[in-house]
């Protein structure tokens, strides 16, 4: 029985261990289309450099086998350099670590308030880029 519990504990540990590779790095990203849902109504196109500033605030992250009902923060459609795209939904938990989901799997980690700030900063940079292109 003790061996079964040890194997079971090891499985839980491995299945919820740190997961970073689920989120592509900035080097893999061509562009990110972001729609903010939390307290704002913003849609914009972010760059790989913007993603480089956002991603660290979502990590380290672990699989959450029993996610709660959280308020939506933002949706990001990530267009990768290999032509594939993926959707990342970011959530705003009432307390504790941040949260996001990819492909129906939920993850806890990072800090959703800092993620939101990084997204809003990216929006400001996108507005500045758009203004500079007009001039």
PLM region spans:
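Function-determining sites in protein domains
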Residues: 20-135
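N-terminal signal peptide c-region/cleavage motif recognized by signal peptidases
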Residues: 15-17
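Sec-dependent signal peptide recognition
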Residues: 2-10
């Amino acid at each position: 029985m003790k061996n079964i519990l040890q194997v079971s504990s090891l499985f839980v540990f491995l299945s919820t261990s740190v997961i970073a590779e689920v989120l592509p790095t900035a080097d893999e990203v061509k562009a990110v289309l972001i729609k903010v849902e939390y307290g704002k109504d913003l849609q914009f196109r972010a760059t790989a450099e913007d993603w480089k500033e956002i991603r660290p605030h979502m990590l380290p992250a672990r699989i959450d086998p029993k996610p709660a009902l959280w308020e939506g923060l933002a949706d990001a459609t990530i267009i990768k350099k290999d032509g594939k795209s993926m959707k990342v939904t970011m959530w705003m938990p009432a307390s504790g670590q941040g949260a996001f989901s990819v492909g129906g799997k939920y993850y806890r980690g990072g800090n959703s308030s800092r993620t939101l700030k990084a997204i809003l900063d990216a929006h400001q940079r996108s507005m500045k880029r758009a203004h500079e292109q007009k001039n």
